[in-house]
Amino acid sequence: MNERHLTGAASEMLVAYKFTKAGYTVYYPMLTQSKEDLVVCKDGKFSKVQVKTATTVQTNTGDAKQVRLGGCGRSEYKDGDFDILAVVVDEDVLIFTWDEVKGKTSMCVGKRNKGIKL
């Protein structure tokens, strides 16, 4: 298995753990290549979660953490694909709603886009 797949699997497990600690029930889709990586439920409300791992990129002002959300040969996400984007930044998980990321093909996270820490 390649390093990227291992990192992605570890990120999904970290996000599932953090949601569980926050009182959610976590479900896994049967198909591994679905648009949602997890489904979470709390108080009867279900949400589809897409998990991404932030990578370090060089910018004019120093290092930044970035996630790719499509484009450059990859299909872009559309309405209904997921409700929550969970971004793993080192050991932290930042949560963004679909409305916050809709239409983006990449975004820097942390300093610019803080999200909600899970």
UniProtKB/Swiss-Prot annotation:
Q: Which Pfam families match?
A: PDDEXK_5
Q: What is this protein called?
A: Protein 5.3
Q: Which organism is it from?
A: Escherichia phage T7
Entry's InterPro entries?
PD(D/E)XK_Endonuc, tRNA_endonuc-like_dom_sf
Any one GO MF annotation of this record: nucleic acid binding
